[in-house]
Curated annotation (Swiss-Prot):
Cysteines engaged in disulfide bonds, as pairs: none
PANTHER family xrefs: ENDORIBONUCLEASE YBEY, CHLOROPLASTIC
GO cellular component, one term: cytoplasm
Entry annotated with the keyword Hydrolase: yes
Name of the protein: Endoribonuclease YbeY
Residue positions binding Zn(2+): H100, H104, H110
Keywords: Cytoplasm, Endonuclease, Hydrolase, Metal-binding, Nuclease, Ribosome biogenesis, rRNA processing, Zinc
Cofactor(s) essential for the protein: Zn(2+)
Protein species of origin: Helicobacter pylori (strain HPAG1)
Length: 140
């Protein structure tokens, strides 16, 4: 199940994200938070010590029983900019970010694993007919 906290003026159909959440974590709640560029910068600075805005952050809650799987925080203005730059829809960009974030909630880590997150992202991207993943874009 997907719970959405949209803190931006962005209007979008989140049906695709609900489908993705049901595939990746069918019995768990995932919180999606859409924030401004400045809010993302504050979160990144305060929680990770990185004083810049990023596109997506994930915060798992696995240590706390009977809570959501975690939160995926997406920088909506940056997603919109990237969608325009890359020539695909905002919904597709948010879906890519959401997949990336949820995989982190599930324990995948592209900086440490041996391609497992990239492989899983690729499978989901094909299944949902989405453009290139974040990991693939970063390597190009």
């Amino acid at each position: 199940m997907l719970e959405i906290d949209n803190q931006t003026p962005l209007e979008s159909d989140f049906l695709l994200l609900e489908k993705i959440a049901n595939v990746l974590a069918p019995t768990q709640i995932i919180e999606l938070v859409l924030v401004s560029d400045e809010t993302m910068r504050e979160i990144n600075r305060d929680l990770r010590g990185c004083d810049y805005a990023t596109d997506v952050l994930s915060f798992p809650l696995e240590a706390i029983p009977h809570t959501p799987l975690g939160s995926v925080v997406i920088n909506a203005p940056l997603a919109q900019t990237n969608a325009l730059k890359l020539g695909h829809s905002l919904e597709n960009e948010i879906a890519l970010l959401f997949i990336h974030g949820v995989l982190h909630l599930l324990g995948y880590d592209h900086e440490k694993d041996k391609g497992e997150q990239r492989q899983k992202e690729s499978e989901l991207i094909k299944a949902f007919n989405l453009p290139l993943s974040l990991i693939e874009r970063a390597q190009d």
